[in-house]
Every structure is written in C-alpha cells, then in structure tokens.
Amino acid sequence: MSRADEGRLIHLAKKREREKEDIEKQLRKLEEDKEKCKVGITSKFTANYETMEESVKSKTYGLVSLDDMKNIQKNEISNRDLQVARGASSSTSLAKDSQEAREKEEHVAKHTQKRVLSFAYEDEEEDEDAAPIVPKKRVGMDPTVDTSFLPDKEREEFLRKKKEELAAEWRVKQNTEKNEEITVAYAYWDGSSHRKNMKVKKGNTISQCLARAIEALKKEFTELKACTPENLMFVKEDLIIPHFYTFQDFIVTKAMGKTGPLFVFDSASDVRIRQDAALDYGESHPAKIVLRSWYEKNKHIYPASRWEPFVPSKKYGRNFDDLSDL
C-alpha cells in the first residue's frame, strides 16, 4: 500500500469519527427534548387538578348547600375543559415536533449505516483531496514466444468447421463409391467348384450377394431351391465372412486373408503384400458359397478344415502347414 493510500484512509477514518460524534450529539438532544415534553405535560395536568380543587374550596367557605356545591364544581369543570382545549393546540404541535425529531433520528441512523457499509461515495468525495495513483507499467509481450498451446476460440472454431467439412466430404465420397458396380467371382462349392460371376454394388452386404447367388444357382442345383441366405456361408481366402459386412468395408480397409487380399478391384492391384514363396500367382481366388449343412459334415476334411471365422483385429498369414500344401 502506498503512502497516498495510507493518508487517504487516515483522513476518511477521522471524518467518520467526526460524523459519529455529531450523530451522538443529535441523539442526546432529541432525548432531552423528549424528557422536557413529558415533564411539561405531567406538571400541566397536575397543576390544573390542584388549581381546580383550591378554587372549589375557596368558593365553598363555610356551610354550603348541595346544589350550590354541584354548581360550583360544574363551573370549575367547564373552566378546566376550556383550558385543556386551549392547550390541545400546543400539545399537537409538540407531538408533531416529536414525530419530526423521530423521523430525523431514523434518517440520520440510516444514512450513517450506509456510510459505514459503503466506501464508494466517500471515495468519490475525496478524489480531489487524495494524491493521484500512479498506474503500474505493464510488461510487454514477446512476439517470438510460441502461443499455439494456448486456447484460441477463433482457431478452435476454424478447426471444428474444417473437420465438419472434411467429414461431410468423406460421407459424400463413401456414398458415391458404395453405388459403384463391381464384378465378384464366386463358386458354389459342394465338393467341386462351379465358378460364376455376378455384378453387385460396393455397398451391398454379403447377405444380399448370397440372395442373388441363390437366384442364379437354384435352377442348376435343386438343393438351393428352398434355401435362404442364412443357410449359406460365404468363404473368401479361407475366412468365413459374416453376412452383415459390405464389400466396401473390405475395400476401404484393404483387409487381408490367409492367401491374399479379401477383395481387390484395382486395375493394378498389389495382390500380395507379404514376402513369401507364394507371391506370384494368377488371379485372385473366387469366393466360395457353401451350404452350412455341407460344412458341418465335411469341416474335418480339406479344404473346409482350414476355414475359420473372420476376426477384424486378427492378422492373417500363411503358416508352415499352409505352405506345405502348395
């Protein structure tokens, strides 16, 4: 705290003490006025009563009849009422003065309380007398400091809008790609291969592909006439693919099977992304469509013995037993 602030506080404290003394003097004066009013009223009524008694006694000297006594008392009472009526105006003015004094006392007390609780008004009054406050110098900022880690609303809003634009662009691109047609090579497997081709969209599911395969094969294979997609299995690269996957899921992620990519439809596809003895071979293996009942009967026999359910998080590759079959 500076010396100017200390002097200012001392000045304000002295001023409050003076105001407090003035208020106490006013309160004492009001109390004295109240006491005087009470004494004046009491003495006035007592004096009037004693004066009336003395007047009656002086006028009833000696023996007086009852009627005369009553008339004298009646006259004295009427005289007293007249005096009281004359003094009513003075008592009314006195009560009015007392009420005004009470209101003034309340106003002074209220004003004093406000002055005690608030320093703002007093500070404004003392602005001219107080010494000027010297503002502190602000340290300059270094423009070479990296502030990218600090929060920036404008930058965050820009990044948020950019992410939304990229996400919308990606969704539009995915929807466009899902509507593209591809040719899928498949073979109905009942112990021997019956290869065919069909055109589907990248966004079609494996279940939709199986339904179309049933329509194409049921004329040739009678066991498929009453068949549904749930009765069939879709096997690709020795992996049993669940029916809810789409072709787009495997194309985008470039999922690999045991013997190569699950689905590659590029003109120059990198069919093998592994360095092993089976790199060079012809076209990709066609998908196998198999009855579940046939698989349950023959799953211990090659090639069904090598099939296993597809797990997205698992990395597939050829092991020693697979290479020995080549």
UniProtKB/Swiss-Prot annotation:
Coiled-coil region list: none
Disordered, as annotated region: 76-112
GO-annotated cellular components: nucleus
Pfam families listed in its UniProt record = XAP5
Q: Name one GO biological process term.
A: chromatin organization
Q: Where is the composition biased (Basic and acidic residues)?
A: 97-109
InterPro entries for this protein: FAM50A/XAP5_C (IPR048337), XAP5 (IPR007005)
Give the family this protein belongs to, as stated in its UniProt record: Belongs to the FAM50 family.
Q: What is this protein called?
A: Protein FAM50 homolog
Say which species the protein is native to.
Answer: Caenorhabditis briggsae
